[in-house]
């Protein structure tokens, strides 16, 4: 666990001035992009370690260097009976030419793949 990064989970509610969920999603996207750029501008020593797997009102994306059997223990909210989801997707990265590390763990916002997309 020495290599494990700090993980923070935030929840942002839609304000009264945002008319619908689509507008809220657009606002969250802009907030995430601005914050990512600001982190680089601020010259934070470990800026490369800042990563937002998701900032969405529709999806939760978790990042971890885990096996499938470790998910429920590491992210206990996935076992909470109050958390309702239509879908859960897990991708396990098995390094073939690099040493496993947290920064290489796959956090997919939209798609999971093996890193070799070569056809459309």
Regions found by a protein language model. Give the residues of each.
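N-terminal segments that mediate ammonia production and transfer
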Residues: 1-120
């Amino acid at each position: 666990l020495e290599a494990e990064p700090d993980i923070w989970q935030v929840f942002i509610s839609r304000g009264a001035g945002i008319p619908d969920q689509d507008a809220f999603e657009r606002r969250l996207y802009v907030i995430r992009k601005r914050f990512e750029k600001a982190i680089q501008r601020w010259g934070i020593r470990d800026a490369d370690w800042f990563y937002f797997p998701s900032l969405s009102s529709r999806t939760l994306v978790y990042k971890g260097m885990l096996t499938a059997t470790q998910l429920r223990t590491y992210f206990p909210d996935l076992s909470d009976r109050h958390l309702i989801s239509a879908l859960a997707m897990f991708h396990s990265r098995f390094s073939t030419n690099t040493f496993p590390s947290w920064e290489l763990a796959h956090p997919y916002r939209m798609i999971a793949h093996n890193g070799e997309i070569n056809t459309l």
